UniProtKB/Swiss-Prot annotation:
InterPro entries, per database record: Ribosomal_bL19, Ribosomal_bL19_CS, Ribosomal_bL19_sf, Translation_prot_SH3-like_sf
Record carries keyword Ribosomal protein: yes
MF GO annotations: structural constituent of ribosome
Gene: rplS
Transmembrane spans: none
Keyword Protein biosynthesis: no
Annotated protein name in UniProt: Large ribosomal subunit protein bL19
Family (UniProt): Belongs to the bacterial ribosomal protein bL19 family.
Biological role stated in the UniProt entry: This protein is located at the 30S-50S ribosomal subunit interface and may play a role in the structure and function of the aminoacyl-tRNA binding site.
Assigned keywords, A-Z: Ribonucleoprotein, Ribosomal protein
Gene3D superfamilies in alphabetical order: 2.30.30.790
GO cellular component: cytosolic large ribosomal subunit
Name of a matching Pfam family: Ribosomal_L19
Taxonomic source organism: Magnetococcus marinus (strain ATCC BAA-1437 / JCM 17883 / MC-1)
Entry's Gene Ontology BP terms: translation
Length: 116
């Protein structure tokens, strides 16, 4: 491990990030600053992809808002991300669900993963 990797590893916070992946429905609590006030805004949707790159890890969440698709990419270890909740685990066979961008309504549903 070189010095850059060691430094990045030491900078990763000890906060517990839940295990999630593509297909999971997430609630992301984001800190939003409006003027002098700061509040928590919740963004709920399906995780369509995750990039694991140590401190620079990100994930993308997609939801349909008023008939329009909205995607947001969040850094996993950002101080702006207050909390990540996993609502349900989806059963998918792909790591990136970019094909959901062309689907709406029932066609964009994802089966729930069951642990029997």
């Amino acid at each position: 491990m070189n010095q850059v990797q060691a430094f990045e590893q030491s900078m990763i916070p000890e906060t517990a990030v839940p295990k999630f992946g593509a297909g999971d429905t997430l609630k992301v609590h984001v800190k939003v600053v409006e003027g002098t006030r700061e509040r928590i805004q919740v963004f709920e949707g399906v995780c369509i992809g995750r990039m694991n790159a140590g401190l620079r890890s990100t994930f993308t969440v997609r939801k349909i808002s008023f008939g329009e698709g909205v995607e947001r990419t969040f850094p996993v270890y950002s101080p702006r991300v207050d909390k990540i909740e996993v609502i349900r685990h989806g059963d998918v066979r792909r790591a990136k669900l970019y094909y959901l961008r062309g689907r709406t309504g029932k066609a964009s549903r994802i089966k729930e993963k069951r642990d029997w």
